[in-house]
Every structure is written in C-alpha cells, then in structure tokens.
Amino acid sequence: MSELQLIITTHGRKDKQLTLESLIGSGLMQRTTLVCPQKEYGYLRSLRDDYNVVAQPDPNWYLPEKRDWVVKEWVRRGHDKIVLLDDDLRFSTRISKDDWHLRPITGKELAAEFQRLEDKLGPEFPHVGFAQRQGNNTIEEVGWKTPGKQVCMMAYYLPIVAKEVDWGLVVCRGDMCATLQLLLKGYPNAVLTETCHDQREFDAPGGCSRYRTVEMLNSEAEKFVNLFPGYASIAKKEYNKKTSKSDKKDSAIRLELIVQWQKALEEGTRVRKDKQ
C-alpha cells in the first residue's frame, strides 16, 4: 500500500490556510496537496515549496464535485489511501485520560495522530477520521468508535470508496452522505474520539459559503432524508445569520440532519452477508 496522502480542498482562502498551518513541522508536507482554482494556484504555490498544489479542472465546481474528482484522480495516480481535508480546520486532543479538556495539537504530534488513521485505514475500515470537537467532552471513554459521524475530514481506502460512493447525490453534507452510503453497503467506519477537529468559523468567507445559503441547506436536508428514508430525519434549529450590515443579525431556521449510523451499518452488514 502507498502512504496516506493529505488532500486539502480550498477555494477563496488564499491567506487563511488553517489546516495547512497545523501541518507545518509535521513531516507530512511532502504528502500534502492543495487543490484549488487555477486563479489561486500561483499564490498558493509561492507560499512554500514543501507541499504540492494542483489546479482543479473546473473552477466553478461545488465541493462534492471536487471531492469526486480528487478520488478519481488519486486513484489514477496510483494511490490507495487519502484523507480529504477542509481548509479551515484546527485539531485538538485530550490533555490526559483523566482530564477531558482539550489542547491544540500541531506538527509532529499531529503527524502521530494521522499515522493512527493510516494504520486503521484499509479493507476492514475503508473510511476513518477524527471526531468533531463539539460534544467531545461528553465522551467518557475515548478511542475508536464504530460507526460514527464524519464531516470536514475523511480518510478513505480508495479501492473501495472510489467504487461505492456516488458524490452526485447531494450538494450539501456530501461527507455525511458518503459515510451513510458506505455503511449501508456494509463497510464500517472508525472515528477516533481521542483527537478531534473543528472549524474556526462556520460559513466563513470562501469555501462553500460562496454558494451555500440557509435555503439551500434546508432544501438539501429534505433531499437527504428522501434519499435515505428510515435512516435520516430532520430537526429544526434556530440560529443567527449575518446580514449585509456586519453589526446586525437576523434569526433563521436551519434544518439539521439526524442520522442513524448504527442502524445503517447493521442493515448494510446484513445485506452484504446475504450477497456473499
């Protein structure tokens, strides 16, 4: 097997490469690639010479289209393990087994955690990742959780994922959609809860915010539920959205997804066994 490749998908955040900053000093830069629109290639290429930059064929792609291309392109390049990363991530880990508080993790210490992902990733667990920071302090015993929710960063074993995931089903929450597709086909994932990630700011300028609206998110949530009846449902959440005036906010209702990951894996395992 080839070494795990780190792929950061980025758009409109040339000066705010938070994920990349966490990797400085990790020894992983040679295996890291930024995938960006052609107009951002020159600037991102000029920042450092120890990572790779690739211009995406279509500058107008939405994130699922870019992820689909990355999966196929890295298969073509002969790789079998990748981790897809959003460009605005920070990483944390438990202070100790007895102290549930989190501390930042970067560089070589973060590299050791990526090695744990690489070691876990393979035919038995073709999709793995770090847990979300939100709610981490409610987990009493940390370690590998199967199944679990994966968003913003997903490590994939390409011989399986490239064949089994359809990235064209939804525009928003494509990471959750990919996880659910794989579980329903009997492929378990593993989420490391000891180390976690979070976004510095939801809907920050650049990235998906250039096309994603509350209306689109809500429409896509309903589409998701219709695609996976019995495994996904909707909960309404009120939050404040920014208006054209930076000092003023409007209240909006966003439809959040509730996904039954365990039920999906149990059904997928049964179906997969029946086919064998």
Regions found by a protein language model. Name each.
Residues 2-4, 14-15, 170-172, 176-276:
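C-terminal catalytic/acceptor-binding lobe
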Residues 2-5, 24-34, 50-52:
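Short loop->beta transition adjacent to catalytic acidic/histidine clusters or analogous donor-positioning motifs
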Residues 5-27, 40-46:
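Short, well-formed alpha-helical segments that are part of the catalytic scaffolds
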Residues 8, 30-38, 128:
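Short, hydrophobic beta-strand segments that form beta-sheet elements in well-ordered domains
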Residues 13, 88-90, 133-136, 196-198:
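Short, solvent-exposed loop/turn segments at secondary-structure junctions
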Residues 34, 81-86, 126-131, 189-193, ...:
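A structural signal for short, well-ordered beta-strand segments and their strand-loop junctions
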Residues 35-85, 90-105:
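Active-site-proximal specificity loops/subdomain of glycosyltransferases
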Residues 92-176, 184:
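Conserved catalytic core of nucleotide-sugar-dependent glycosyltransferases
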